[in-house]
Each structure stands twice: as C-alpha cells, then as structure tokens.
Amino acid sequence: MEEKKYLKWYNKIGYGSGDVAGNVVYAFLTSFMMVYLTDSVGLAAGVVGTLIAVSKLFDGFTDIFFGSMIDKTHSKMGKAKPWMLYGYIGCAITLVCCFAVPVSLGTTAKYAWFFISYTLLNGVFYTANNIAYSALTSLITKNSKERVQMGSYRFIFAFSTSLLIQAITVGFVDKCGGDAAAWRTVAIIYAIIGLVVNTISALSVKELPEEELNEGEVKDDNEKYGMVQAFKLLVKNKYYMMICGTYILQQLYGAMIGAGIYYMTWVLKNKNLFGQFAWAVNIPLIIALIFTPTLVGKWKGMYKLNLRGYVLAVIGRALVVVAGYMGSVPLMMAFTALAALGQGPWQGDMNAVIASCSEYTYLTQGKRIDGTMYSCTSLGVKIGGGIGTAVVGWMLELSGYVGKNATQPQSALDMMQFMYLWLPLIFDVLIMFALSRMNVEDANKKLKAEKEIAADEVTDASDMN
C-alpha cells in the first residue's frame, strides 16, 4: 500500500533551504576560522586547537540536553520549530564574534574572546538550532520517501552554500581589505543572510500532531522521561552509536578538506585553487543528491546505495593520493569529484536513516525520542568538526608552521600533504566499514513482522476463547 503523502514541493524546498543558514555558520567556521586566527590575528595554531578541544567537552552534555528539551516541548509551533527559529539569533551574533577578535586586546584576552564566542556558538546556539532542524525530518512527515527527499533537498542547499562560501570567501575578504576587519565584515554579511533564510525555512513547514506521530496513541504523563533515561535509550540503540561515529568521521574528513587552504597556499603555491577544488567536491555531491531518492527506490532501500557509494569514494580518494604525488592538479580534481559522487547518497538519505534509527528505539523500547535521537547530527558535527579543526592546529604547530612567515619549513609542507591527501582516505575507509554494519531498515522490518505475528497470535487466542 502506498504511503500517505504529507508535503508539497514548496515544503520540501523551504525545509531544505534551512541548511543554507546552517552552512553559513559551519562551512565558514570550519574552512576559514583557523586561517583567520593564525594569519590575521596572529594566534598560535596549537593553542587555538587546544581551546577548541576543551570547548568540545561541553558539547556531549548540551547535545543530549537540547535533544531532551525538544522532546519535552509542547507549543503552538510544535516541538522543534521554536528551538530552530530562536536558536539561530544566537548563532548569528556569536558567528560575528568569532571573526571579530578586537586587535586592541592582549594575547591572552584574544584567546579568551575566541574561546567564549566559539563555545557559545557551538555548545549552545548551533546545538539548539541544528538538532531542532534535523528533528523536523521525523516531525513533519511519516512518509519514508518524503524523508529521503527532504534529506536530498537539504544537502543540495548545504553543499551549494558550502561551495559558494569556499569559492568566494578568499576573494571577498581581499576585496574588503584583506585584514582582520575584512573578516568581520564578511561574517556580518553571512550572519544576516543565515538569519533571514533560517526564519523562512522554519515558517515554511508544519509539525504533525503528536497523536498522528504516535500512530493514534496519546502519551500520558507517566511516559515522560528525563535526560538520563533519554541517554540510556540512545546508548541501547547500536545504530545511533554507529551513526554518531560516522558523523564524527565525516566532519573530521571535512576539516581536513577545509585545511586544504594551507595545502593550496603553501604546497601548490596558489590559494585560489581552494575555490576550484570546492567546485570539484560540491558539484558532484549535488548531482548525486538529485538522483538519491530515485536510486533508493530502485535499490529498495538505503543500505546498498550508501555502501556502494562509499566504495566508490574510497577508490576516488586513493586515486587523489596518487595524483597528488604525481603533482597533477587536473587529476586531483577529477578524482576528488569521483570521491564526492560516491559520498553523495549517504549525505542525501542520512536524515532518513536517523529517522529509521529513531523508529528502531520505538519498536524495541516503546518510547519516541525523535529530538534526542537527532542529537547525533549536532554532536557529530561539533565534535568531529571541532576536533578536526583542533587536530589541524596541533599538527601545524607540531610541524613548525608560523602563519605570518613568508616561507614554511619542509616539515610543515609534509604535514599539509599528509592532512590533505592521506587523512581523508583513512576516514573514508572507516566510514565505509561503519556503513557496512548499518542496515537499520531490515532490522525494523523484522521487528515489525515479529510484532504483527505476535498480535495475530493474541487475536487467534482470544477468538478461541
């Protein structure tokens, strides 16, 4: 029987546009924050990396906290929309603060300014906004195909935004003066764009009534649970742990690709190549996302598509390594595009997989924790992206890199090559292995079949009586 449809085309586009706002923060932060702090503000990469790592200590708590708060929220707008809408106001303010370190401050005060701004952005406001935005996947439709389509629309907007930010920011900053004040100006413009688009996205969709989400069952007050119980429900779900780990690996991968600004500047001697490689990454991703819903239907599920895609991604990244040592930029771009094409399907249906993961908890534990379940998206983004950026700082510091120097030692150049060529390949291999174990769709089908058999047996027994 065909599933009920809940969304119009404009709902899907409206929802998807929300990741323009998310990537105005995330792509800008991960691609350019470190180079801004080291080369324009003059801070040490190793110290910045350590501060980012310390900041991540707060994230595990705040992700579960905000996920639990979303599950407990009951408002006219729904569970997630208020958090998505109001959380972004803080995102916009703190994003500007991260790129507006006052030059008049002493060195210690500059580090403190950055740490406070970065922690508030990632640990509080981005968490509230991003978990709520992701949770809408399971709160505005129960249709599995629509959930896949939402993921595709979302990440088409995400990668388009990431592409534009990576492609134009270096030139944009140069046109604004190329100094620390120029970075602040660009951050203000990006923050305003994000705030407007996030508001439009939040208002373009409507959450379903809780009775419909719970298949006609109305929760009573005895079914409420706290953050500790929600955490226990999460760790009992092996698929949640796999998705969380995969998300972290993806963001580590992204941080290394973002560190390509150093590789292009010092190894390839042309910082403008960073924007060209952004096209090689994001255009194939967008193409793959367009076809993901069709391929999911053709292969009757997401598992095979995701796994086969990442086999292709591993092959592509291995060939990037070969091309890098050959010194061929055109081949590096071609194989980068091949890898991105393979990564696309997982990006497109990831939110639908998380919705299936949430369904798995409902089938095994009898409780819905949609908001808390989507904490893996924010947790993975922040821990993976944050630790990835921190690792970049540590590795640069270890290699002897000094941002304001006219030349860099060979040890720094070798480290940049390792970060940009080898680490993305290693992370892709680990993701491929995780995806090979992540067949939550089949697990849910088996559980539903078992419940139907049990229900039939109860019906037969009562008929006999």
Model-inferred region functions:
Residues 2-465:
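Membrane-embedded alpha-helical bundles of multi-pass transporters/translocases
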